[in-house]
Structure formats: C-alpha cells, structure tokens
Design a protein with these regions (language model features):
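Serine-esterase "nucleophile elbow" of acetyl-processing enzymes
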Residues: 1-46, 50-56
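Alpha-helical cap/lid subdomain in secreted, periplasmic
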Residues: 2, 52-191
Length: 191
C-alpha cells in the first residue's frame, strides 16, 4: 500500500484550513494515503522537525518541499501565531521589509546589517542533506521539490518557473499549475 509523507512549507501545506481552495496536496490526498505535515512559512529547520515527528518506516514515499534559504526559525511569530495557516511561520526578509509593526524593526535591521548569507545557506544545505539521509536509511522513495530560484544539494525538481508564471491562491499557484504539480508528483509515485 502506498503511504505518502508530505513535509515542507506553504507550497505543500493545506490551505483549505483557512481558505476555500484546494491545491496539489489536497488532490494528492484524494488519491493516496497522505500524511501532510507541511506548515506555511516555516524554515528548513522546522521542515526537519516535521520529519523528526514521525517514524519514516511507516511511509513508502516522501515528498519534501523545501523553503527559502533565508528563513530564520522562531518559536512564536509576533504577527502570525494565531493565524490558522501561518501559525508556524518563521521570519523571512520579504515579510519584514515593508511591515510597520515595531517588534519587527530589529529583525529588519538584522537582515540588512548582520545577515550572513553564506552561513545560512551552509546550514540550510546541511539540513536538506540530513533529511535526505534519514529517508535513505529507511528506504523511503523521496522526491525533493523547490519553488524557489536556487539549487538544492540533492536531486530535485524545481517549480520556480511555474510559480513565477502561474501565481494563484492555493499553494501560491493557480489551479492549472496545481494540477500540473499534482500530475508530476502522481506520475513519480506510480513510477
């Protein structure tokens, strides 16, 4: 029996908890036994924690949707902690750049004056490889995905062009793009 684990960020989370929409993760859950632990706005560290919260041996397949390399984990986001979709949100520069909330001023200053891109990319790559190695140990067939314009240190599929050209209101992409991602993921599962 095919059992699929989905972990990742908002490109894989269930947006129907807040909005009347269905995205590719919902389509996938309609056809397979799926455990979707993805959390909107989360860092790569929290994606690793999603994996740590389950026994990988229970799954035949894992889909990991990787986030931006510049997300900084926080225990409680001052703006989103009670939001049904964004309650696990971490900091990212684009979110704090134009926000007037006084509590984010120091975060904006950190990104602008102190953020060490090479360090955060290095830590990000270590976490991605750790996730991949754990799933390999359990012989879980693994699909790594990103919607961001960067290369992962593991074999992956990049849907950044789809995101750039087909933005929408379910998992950041329109219905056509969600169907396209679903079709590709379904094909990978059945191969």
């Amino acid at each position: 029996m095919t059992k699929v684990l989905v972990i990742g960020d908002s490109f894989a989370s269930d947006w129907s908890v807040k909005y009347p929409v269905s995205g590719w993760p919902n389509f996938l859950a309609n056809e397979f036994t799926v455990t979707n632990l993805a959390q909107s706005g989360c860092s790569e560290y929290k994606i690793k924690k999603q994996l740590d919260s389950v026994n990988p041996a229970q799954y035949t397949h894992a889909i990991i949707v990787h986030t931006s390399k510049s997300r900084i984990p926080v225990e409680i986001h001052p703006l989103h902690n009670s939001d049904a979709l964004l309650h696990s949100c971490d900091f990212i520069y684009s979110d704090v750049l134009d926000n007037n909330y006084s509590g984010l001023k120091c975060i904006k200053e950190f990104y602008e004056k102190f953020y060490h891109e090479d360090f955060f990319e290095y830590i990000y790559d270590l976490i991605v490889c750790d996730i991949d190695n754990i799933l390999l140990q359990y012989n879980v067939l693994t699909l790594h995905i990103t919607f961001f314009d960067h290369v992962l240190p593991v074999n992956h599929r990049n849907f950044n062009a789809l995101f750039q050209n087909c933005q929408g209101n379910a998992n950041h992409i329109n219905e056509h793009a969600n169907r396209e991602v679903f079709t590709e993921v379904k094909s990978w599962i059945k191969s």
